[in-house]
């Protein structure tokens, strides 16, 4: 067995990046193909083999596995310090909950139903669901929901409810919607019409109106984004409802709110459109491992009780009814979410939101001060900027990229100091790209607006912002 170990290799002239050589985790802009990945697993000693019959060999292999695991922990610790492009909150300590990992907890079926199995965490799950019901203004006897495997499952569930209520409905989703929304349309064989977006990533309501008016005979199933994946744009629920009703869709529409990241943040912003079941929406989903932070992917989906009943089925084997997508569900996630919400409360979450938003504004200004095109939506902790020319920078800082753009999601664990180091490094490398190698600075006016573009054409007309 090749032991897992962390080593430092040069990624550029000024900085080092870690590589776990035995895992084949190289700093490269290229993705490994399926065959390459299989070869890496075999080559690096990660292929699963039967334990040796000889006691000494078995003991040696056991020690090797321990070293491999310890090395991988070291690798994850190091790489977590350079994680900027994806919405994960690493700022937590769940060590007091470690004893729960000695139990296999399965919250199969309806979390509110009695079951024969006693090894579960349903009471924690219901407590978490009640918290979110209060968060989104729905009375406890008027909602149903469950803890999901993440934002995608929440979208799949919410849009399935919409499809069941309106079997002949058309799904309307903006171009900036998460890919899981279009996956749901394909899975459920629902006609899907894409809606244009503004430069900020928000739904273009004029385009929504136009497309609704061309399909007035079919009910509308709307996916509203409370924070788009790449730009963090927030669709205005009130504007969507108004557009639907002006187009003659009264009582013939269903709105699902994809609130994966920003759904935990916008309620703490006074200027944000309020997402609430006091409005005629059908469901809301949010991720638990993003802003809240959780070791395992998870999420929450809430719908109206009357809507949930269209999916409910009694299952004799588990002595419960089930309206969920997956059936078996992670019973540890509810405990971790309950623990976080209990420790932080509204005041703690409010504080974290303000810190993240402040740091996001700082990053946007800092990028612009060194001449880098950048933009940050008012209600978002996501900063979009010019994609680095060197993919090693993308890899080192684990940036998410789309076309000419990259983005950083400023989470609670992303500090002021870390952002400063990143911008200093990027600015230094950028001089090499544009001065020494003669690259042209790309124009991003179409992507983020000319007021945020620092290309040669637009930079002369802009003022450098101050802190």
From Swiss-Prot:
Function: Catalyzes the biosynthesis of ethanolamine from serine. Decarboxylation of free serine is the major source of ethanolamine production in plants and ethanolamine metabolism is crucial for the synthesis of choline, phosphatidylethanolamine (PE) and phosphatidylcholine (PC), and thus for plant growth.
UniProt keyword annotations, A-Z: Decarboxylase, Lyase, Pyridoxal phosphate
Cited Gene3D superfamilies: Aspartate Aminotransferase, domain 1, Type I PLP-dependent aspartate aminotransferase-like (Major domain)
Positions of post-translational N6-(pyridoxal phosphate)lysine modification: 290
Keyword hit for Transmembrane: no
Keyword Disulfide bond: no
Recorded coiled-coil stretches: none
Amino-acid positions noted as binding substrate in the UniProt annotation, renumbered to this chain: 178
Cofactors required: pyridoxal 5'-phosphate
Catalysed reactions, semicolon-separated: L-serine + H(+) = ethanolamine + CO2
GO molecular function: pyridoxal phosphate binding; serine decarboxylase activity
EC number of this enzyme: 4.1.1.-
InterPro entries for this protein: Group_II_Decarboxylase, PyrdxlP-dep_de-COase, PyrdxlP-dep_Trfase, PyrdxlP-dep_Trfase_major, PyrdxlP-dep_Trfase_small, Pyridoxal-P_BS
Family: Belongs to the group II decarboxylase family.
Protein name per its UniProtKB record: Serine decarboxylase 2
GO BP: carboxylic acid metabolic process
Pfam families, sorted: Pyridoxal_deC (PF00282)
